[in-house]
Regions:
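Cytosolic/matrix-facing juxtamembrane and C-terminal tails of multi-pass cellular membrane proteins
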Residues: 1-8, 159-170, 177-208
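Short, structured motif recognition centered on aromatic/hydrophobic residues
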Residues: 15-40, 73, 97-131, 137-142, ...
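Hydrophobic faces of alpha-helical transmembrane segments in multi-pass integral membrane proteins
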Residues: 24, 28, 51, 115, ...
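Membrane interfacial helix motifs at helix-loop boundaries and amphipathic/re-entrant anchors
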Residues: 37-54, 136-173
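Hydrophobic alpha-helical membrane-embedded segments
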Residues: 44-79, 181-186
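Membrane-spanning helices that line or support transport/gating and their immediate boundary helices
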Residues: 65, 69-72, 76, 141, ...
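Membrane-cytosol interface motif
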Residues: 76-84, 202-208
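Short membrane-interface loop/juxtamembrane segments of multi-pass integral membrane proteins
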Residues: 82-115, 153-164
Length: 208
């Protein structure tokens, strides 16, 4: 059975693909950001003793590999092709390292690793909170009994509307869950679009 691209399949299939893309983006982003910032800082700080040049070159090559990984992820989640970048052989020694450092595409790959990280943090947080929050609020009536009860433990409904009714508390949280789940598909789609457009803008020859 042919696989349906995430960007063109049924809503549920596309939603799972986009949610997986966003949630997997943070751990990958942490690793990529660490490589980019650490390698760049170490390379620049040691340029005076020449060891910085191969460190920078190695960092840029690693950035290129990580950028290709993101290109594959973007192509998979959008269902649109995203050509990989295959740099020519840089050569060995100082000449090869210098050739890598002079390659503009390598620097764009590195910039993407750094710039994309804050967005990955935001999209991960919003996607996780919106999805799990919606499920948790919808099922509030099944676990609200475990919350501390008493004069010093006021629920959101009581704080907002001065209503301590348990029915009102359950009703408010259930409606909140319905609203979150009713809007989760467009929210996830918007977050995915923001992240993939940034990738296409920095990792391809033309913006999406």
């Amino acid at each position: 059975m042919p696989q349906v691209p995430a960007g063109r399949g049924p809503v549920a299939h596309r939603f799972r693909g986009e949610l997986g893309y966003l949630l997997s983006g943070l751990p990958l982003g942490v690793a990529a950001f660490t490589v980019a910032v650490t390698g760049f800082a170490l390379g620049v700080s040691t340029l005076a003793v020449w060891i910085g040049l191969p460190i920078l070159a190695g960092t840029l090559r690693a950035a290129g590999s990580l950028a290709n990984s993101e290109r594959r992820r973007v192509a998979a989640v959008t269902g649109r092709p995203f050509p990989l970048h295959h740099p020519g052989p840089a050569g060995a020694g100082w000449a090869g390292a210098l050739r890598t450092v002079r390659e503009p595409r390598s620097w764009r790959d590195l910039v993407h690793l750094v710039v994309a990280f804050p967005l990955q943090v935001v999209t991960f947080g919003v996607a996780l909170t919106w999805t799990l929050g919606g499920v948790g609020e919808l099922l509030y009536f099944t676990w609200s009994w475990a919350l501390p009860q008493g004069p010093g433990n006021q629920g959101l409904v009581e704080l907002m509307f001065d209503n301590s009714s348990r029915a009102a508390d359950i009703g408010f949280n259930t409606v909140t869950g319905v609203v979150l789940l009713a809007t989760v598909v467009p929210v996830i789609r918007g977050l995915t679009a923001a992240q993939t457009r940034l990738a296409r803008a920095l990792l391809s020859d033309r913006a999406a």
